[in-house]
């Protein structure tokens, strides 16, 4: 069992880190090509990315969990979950496409951009929103391939799509001189690579996933999303945090402060990806064991996942405390002293929260995998919306920028109590 856990988790960690490099690569190359204005524009529109990924995650992961559990129970209706998930993603994507075509400038302004930032970010926003169906469907394909016993292919899909993004970020932004538009194109095309790689498994004889046509059903969508909601909130919480923090930081420190937060937030994406890797690597195993009634095995996977998250959190905090100046300098091409000061202190304070966040991310995924929706939903709402918003406003009012950075660890600490209570209720 330990070997199986290591196989699934290690491959999912690599895959999720690869996915996080979508934004990190954009941040790095944009900082070199456009400077702090580009980072600010990117950070303001990140919540839109988060929303797109969150919807794809909720539908994809939720449908994949229902598929595995029902398939193991012998329910033939499970065969239409894949088609149903893709169909809903495409239908929902139309909303994002229309916004991207007609009002990307208004969207950037609504998210806090002034006239200079709107001019910098509107074309970037338009381009990536036009490719929304591919982002969402990539998440669905990856979740089903992973849950169908092919984590290696799922990992390769995310890694190679991210590698494409990084390479073409450079090519389009520098040799071809396309600037922000080049970064958007590279990021927008990369999920197509992921989908094509997933098709290697989906079109093979080993694949048990069927593309059986189904009429779109709101009832079935909600049923799938009930167990995918923790994945939704795990993704969307980053967007909510970004919007709240941007609003507060614009008031406290202006555009330079938002650029500093961009460094902190985008670096933290890699950390979140590590914990999502543990969570999503554990989830297929737990869903499988749970569907077969093997509760002892579920408990063993749970313990290994929690210990892994604590170990990774400790290593992350040690790394950031030691190398915060170096991490900041990578994104500070203009050598702005204020940006460096804000970002270095922000990294050190913000990252302490991953001791608790790791447990919360892993715990939420496990609760969803065993269909314990109540606690998974409560924890997701607490960490993604309620606690982080309350602490951000309260601590920033009391301690300024230091309070902004401390809001994340405070919110994760409070949420951890819900997760621990939910896991204890399972009596594994």
What residues fall within each predicted segment?
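Short alpha-helical transmembrane segments in multi-pass integral membrane proteins
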Residues: 1-13, 67-131, 178-229, 286-352, ...
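N-terminal transmembrane alpha-helices
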Residues: 1-34, 47-62, 66, 90-97, ...
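Transmembrane helical elements of multi-pass membrane transporters/channels
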Residues: 7-26, 127, 138, 161, ...
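Helix-terminus/linker motif at the lipid-water interface of multi-pass membrane proteins
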Residues: 21-40, 108-115, 171-178, 239-266, ...
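Structural signal for membrane-spanning alpha-helices in multi-pass inner-membrane proteins
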Residues: 27, 100, 143, 169, ...
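Small-residue hotspots at the loop-to-helix junctions and early N-terminal turns
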Residues: 36-47, 121, 125, 184, ...
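Small-residue-rich hydrophobic transmembrane alpha-helices
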Residues: 39-98, 135-154, 260-324, 357-379, ...
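Short runs within selected transmembrane alpha-helices of multi-pass transporters and secretion channels
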Residues: 60, 127-146, 154-165, 183-198, ...
């Amino acid at each position: 069992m330990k070997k199986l856990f290591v196989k699934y988790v290690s491959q999912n960690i690599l895959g999720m880190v690869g996915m996080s490099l979508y934004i990190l690569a954009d941040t790095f190359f944009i900082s070199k090509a456009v400077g702090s204005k580009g980072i600010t524009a990117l950070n303001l529109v990140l919540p839109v990315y988060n929303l797109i990924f969150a919807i794809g995650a909720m539908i994809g992961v939720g449908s994949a969990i229902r598929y595995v559990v029902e398939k193991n129970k012998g329910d033939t209706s499970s065969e239409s979950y894949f088609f149903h998930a893709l169909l809903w993603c495409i239908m929902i994507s139309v909303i994002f496409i229309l916004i991207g075509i007609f009002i990307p400038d208004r969207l950037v302004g609504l998210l806090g951009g002034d006239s200079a930032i709107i001019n910098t970010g509107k074309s970037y926003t338009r381009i990536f929103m036009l490719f929304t169906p591919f982002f969402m469907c990539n998440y669905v394909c990856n979740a089903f391939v992973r849950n169908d016993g092919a984590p290696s292919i799922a990992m390769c899909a995310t890694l190679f799509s991210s590698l494409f993004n990084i390479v073409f970020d450079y090519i389009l932004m520098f040799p071809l001189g396309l600037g922000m538009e080049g970064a958007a194109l590279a990021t927008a095309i990369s999920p197509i690579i992921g989908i094509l790689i997933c098709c290697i498994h989906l079109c093979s004889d080993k694949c048990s996933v069927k593309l059986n046509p189904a009429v779109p059903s709101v009832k079935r969508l909600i049923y799938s999303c009930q167990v995918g909601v923790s994945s939704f909130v795990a993704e969307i919480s980053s967007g909510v945090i970004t919007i709240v923090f941007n609003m507060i930081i614009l008031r406290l420190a202006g555009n330079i402060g938002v650029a500093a937060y961009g460094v902190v937030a985008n670096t933290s994406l890699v950390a979140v990806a590590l914990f999502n890797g543990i969570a999503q690597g554990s989830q297929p195993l737990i869903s499988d064991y749970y569907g077969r009634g093997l509760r002892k095995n579920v408990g063993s996977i749970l313990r290994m996942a929690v210990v892994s998250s604590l170990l990774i959190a400790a290593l992350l905090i040690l790394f950031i405390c030691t190398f915060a100046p170096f991490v900041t300098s990578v994104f500070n091409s203009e050598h702005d002293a204020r940006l460096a000061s804000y970002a270095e202190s922000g990294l050190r304070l913000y990252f302490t929260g991953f001791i608790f966040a790791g447990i919360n991310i892993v715990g939420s995924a496990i609760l969803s995998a065993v269909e314990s929706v109540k606690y998974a939903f409560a924890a997701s709402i607490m960490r993604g919306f309620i606690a982080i918003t309350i602490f951000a406003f309260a601590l920033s009012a009391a301690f300024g920028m230091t309070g902004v950075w401390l809001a994340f660890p405070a919110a994760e600490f409070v949420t951890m109590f819900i997760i621990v209570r939910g896991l204890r209720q399972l009596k594994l």
